[in-house]
Amino acid sequence: MTGQFKFRTTAGLMLAALAVVSACKLSRSDTSRPEAARDFPQAFRPVSAVGGTEFAAEDQRDNLGEAQVVMDLAAIKPGMRVADIGAGEGYYTVRLTERVGPKGRVLAEDIDPVSIQNLGRRVERERLDNVSIITGTPEDAKLPADSFDRIMMVHMYHEVSEPYAFLWYLRPALKPGGQVVVVDVDRPTDQHGIPPRLLFCEFGALGFRLVQFVSKPELNGYYAAFEVAGARPAPKDIKPCNTASGKTGTQ
């Protein structure tokens, strides 16, 4: 009986191992996912369709004092290097360039060719000499390593369909002591928002630590800032967050 039990246990372990290997192979062969994301776990949450390039009219946002509140919370100072991810038409890019001044730099990133083109024209028209523009991909913002004091993601993180790959590629771009700033809305991910608990879980899975969280009406949502707190995990070691339609997040 004992020998039979050992045989069954060994067989069960072998089957489990084969299942893991098969799952890895399936992930690598899943052509519906970007090649650069296939080594990472898939997020178990719905994602909103990419919204328009203008979250709201710029004067309306200025009347609420949105950008000033966000930049104050993020402690954006002259001389800093800041990345504006999902820059769109450049609402934050323009205001960040004023805040960091001529000795600072702003890198504006987007994945939409039309937005990139329009933003390029705006930068040229307004002679924003301390702004650079790059085109990223949905799973990788393509930021240079060790370059930024702040990485800003305003009302766009909920549109990231490969969060584990995205944050893994993003993380090395921070300078020591740098922060990733997220401004978003507390609602399900398929309704153009992300619950804070799920946000914390996804960032935690990549070795980030929450350092500030504020909810303000001027933001039409909440502000969250993260710092690197541990080693960057290997893609295969990342533990995906369990979710219920993007409403919760626990590892």
Describe every region a protein language model picked out.
Residues 25-83:
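Class I SAM-dependent transferase core
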Residues 21-23:
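C-terminal motif of bacterial Sec signal peptides marking the signal peptidase cleavage site
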Residues 78-79, 102-103, 174-180:
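Short glycine-dipeptide loop
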Residues 200, 210, 216-251:
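Core SAM-dependent methyltransferase catalytic element
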Residues 83-141:
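Class I SAM-dependent methyltransferase SAM/SAH-binding core
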Residues 149-163:
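A short SAM/SAH-binding and catalytic strip from SAM-dependent methyltransferases
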Residues 139-151:
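A short acidic, Gly/Pro-enriched loop at the edge of an enzyme's catalytic core
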Residues 97-98, 164-179:
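A short glycine-rich, Lys/Arg-flanked "PGG" loop and its adjoining helix->strand segment in the class I
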